[in-house]
Amino acid sequence: LAVMLMAAPLSGCFGIGGSGGLFGEEEEKEPLRLNHLQMEGTHNSYHIEPLVSPTREYLYTHEPLNVQAAELGVRQFEIDVWWDVREGLRVYHNQYDSGTTCPTFEDCLSTLLAWSEANDRHHPLMIWVEPKDWPEQAADITTTVELSGILQDIEDEIAEFWPRNRTITPDDVRGEWPSLNEGVLNDGWPLLEESRGKAVFILLAGGDMRDLYIDDH
């Protein structure tokens, strides 16, 4: 699966070694894993301030995604995705706040992937993807589709534009265990050294959309 539904927090430490032992001996430390990381993140990571804004909440502009990664140390990104009848998956906030550094989902993926491939020892990227489907928030050129349709389109584009060997998926974490939860409890999250240069795609959704995705997978 390309998109990971994250059910547990990724920050915080679980038993990472503490103080040294007697006579200055240090206890052996647990190797760092994915869930030990804390990272800088941006919301509406693609956002450009509109020329005219109905609210002060829209008055900010983010650097392009690759600049955020390269110069600001951002490793967590949040991307809103709409389905457009003419152009497929588009990225913007809403019809009143549509400025974006990467107009399509493909643009966003390509921008981050180019940076990732040029810096392949980076800490893993957490890419939160929020599908937008509400008719009252859709722009004129946006047509609402069935929830399962936009979810499948998102997975298809991730699979097409982001190499499988550069992603961490639920199957990777689950391993040989029957469920993702059992995999985490028994084997733990992936090691940091094994996760460098990769990305985790996380579905940011609740309610019917989240339930539908879980039922389908």
Region roles according to the model:
Residues 1-23:
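Secretory targeting signatures
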Residues 22-217:
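Catalytic cores of phosphodiester-bond hydrolases, prominently lipid phosphodiesterases
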